[in-house]
Amino acid sequence: SLYPSAMYRLEGYLKGKPKILENLNYEFLKKQDGYFVEIIIEKVNKKYNFPLMSKLTKEGIRDWTNDMENEYMNVDKTTLEEIIKYHKIEFKIVRGYYYNEGRNYTLREVIKKLFDKRIKAKKYNNPIQNIYKLLMNSCYGKCLLKPIDTETKYVSNNDYNTFVSYNYNWIKEGEQLNDNRWKFKLYKSIDDHFNLVHCGVEVLSMSKRIMNEVLCLAEDLDIEMYYTDTDSIHINNSKIKLLADEFKKLNGRDLIGKGMGQFHTDFSSDILKGEILAKRSIFLGKKCYIDELYGSESG
């Protein structure tokens, strides 16, 4: 539940209209509710194996790298705070927008309610828990919705001529499915498309903060991490207690658990018994790997 946890921790979405940033002083920015700015990174004083900074290559690929000196980067409030905290960067603000009209804290209340309902449903193996999960993730995903520039229509043979005569300017392609039905793909106007991309960006950045607190601490403790994805880390089981203890010292809360913002083993099996771990893993690329599992009580 990474994104629901991020929304809960974010507390609320920004209210009001963005204002053009004229005061390029970071001390001014820190006092605002939120901001989205372009910075130029002058110096990176600390590097990580899993860098928190990125840039686009000439091929359009996002490259996560420590080599960011004299590079421009677009950041929101959370991201800038993170790279200052962990990479110890020195930077200048180039331009941007800021918000200073508060936040709508209804988000936190709604997410907590849905999260608790899902926990209760999972306890009784009620499949409605999947609906609660979808609702929570949609509170994030809907904010970043890209323009939908096509729509699909199914038309019977009897209505074919009428449909084509009224819509010929918008038809992208058509396909006859059977003796009595056609499938048309039409161009759709995006003039009235609207999203809340700034809200989605803040949720994504907060989700990365949740991961950064674990990833960066583990690296500072010289704990090896073999692979990390959106909401998971492959790490030696023998090092988890050390990581959890240090995490609690730093943050004043438990790392391990199934509550909001906590981490737990994600392996499950109907065959293996006891604590389920991976004895070996083969990684081929992003989201392409296999784990060989065993159970502490079944081998």
Listing of model-derived features with the role each one plays in the protein:
Residues 1-299:
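Conserved acidic
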